């Protein structure tokens, strides 16, 4: 049986590894899929009102393409977030360290071990990096998706049948951002 100190150290290591893993929490997954669904459903209005594709007759097509696009956009969110999180953490490290050290010196008069201070700084740095990477990932991918949908729909595929235009523009847009998100830079 492992000593209690070993179990505590193992749980701290697990928490640290969890911060740097590609796995998303349930909250992040819900946020990503919720945003991806909304952004993927926006082009329905465009095709219903401008391209005159009937909502009822095209409901199955709209549903299938929205679900496929939702998955690909959420995949892009996750990939971009993972790449950005480490870059943001490195850039924000000094500022977060100063802020946490200042707050600890103001609020805590008791002596805190150096290890505990470092853990709090690391936790705060990861929290800030996670938040900033998440928001930027959503903004970047939403913007790119909607711009590509509009360009594809109105300029590249303008002479196609509206149904084909919808299928190609949505699949190309979501596929492109999913593909671009797999890059490491």
From Swiss-Prot:
Top-rank taxon of the source lineage equals: Eukaryota
* Family of this protein: Belongs to the TRAP-gamma family.
Q: What does this protein do?
A: TRAP proteins are part of a complex whose function is to bind calcium to the ER membrane and thereby regulate the retention of ER resident proteins.
Q: What is this protein called?
A: Translocon-associated protein subunit gamma
Residues on the Cytoplasmic side? 49-54, 158-163
Keyword Nuclease found: no
Cite the ranges annotated as topological domain Lumenal.
1-27, 77-135
Gene Ontology annotations for the cellular component aspect, listed alphabetically: endoplasmic reticulum membrane
> Where's it mainly located?
endoplasmic reticulum
Which positions, given as ranges, span the membrane? Answer: 28-48, 55-76, 136-157, 164-184
Quaternary data:
Heterotetramer of TRAP-alpha, TRAP-beta, TRAP-delta and TRAP-gamma.
Alphabetized UniProt keyword annotations: Acetylation, Endoplasmic reticulum, Membrane, Phosphoprotein, Transmembrane, Transmembrane helix
> What InterPro entries does the record tag this protein with?
SSR3
Q: Which Pfam families match?
A: TRAP-gamma
Query: Where found in the cell?
Result: Endoplasmic reticulum membrane
List Phosphoserine occurrences by residue.
11, 105
As stated in the Swiss-Prot or TrEMBL entry, residues carrying the post-translational modification N-acetylmethionine are 1
Q: What GO biological process terms are annotated to this protein in UniProt?
A: SRP-dependent cotranslational protein targeting to membrane
Instruction: Please give, as recorded in its UniProt entry, the membrane topology of this protein.
Output: Multi-pass membrane protein
């Amino acid at each position: 049986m492992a000593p209690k100190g070993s179990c505590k150290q193992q749980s701290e290591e697990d928490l640290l590894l969890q911060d740097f893993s590609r796995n998303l929490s349930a909250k992040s997954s819900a946020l990503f899929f919720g945003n991806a669904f909304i952004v993927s459903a926006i082009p329905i209005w465009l095709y219903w009102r401008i391209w005159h594709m009937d909502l009822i007759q095209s409901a199955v097509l709209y549903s299938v393409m929205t679900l496929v696009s939702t998955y690909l956009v959420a995949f892009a969110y996750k990939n971009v977030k993972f790449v950005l999180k480490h870059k943001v953490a490195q850039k924000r490290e000094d500022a977060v360290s100063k802020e946490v050290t200042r707050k600890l010196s103001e609020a805590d008069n008791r002596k805190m071990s150096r290890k505990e201070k470092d853990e709090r700084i690391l936790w705060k740095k990861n929290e800030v990096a996670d938040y900033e990477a998440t928001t930027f990932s959503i903004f970047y991918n939403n913007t790119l998706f909607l711009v590509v949908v509009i360009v594809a729909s109105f300029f590249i595929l303008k002479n196609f049948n509206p149904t084909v235009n919808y299928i190609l523009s949505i699949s190309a847009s979501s596929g492109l951002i999913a593909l671009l998100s797999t890059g490491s830079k």
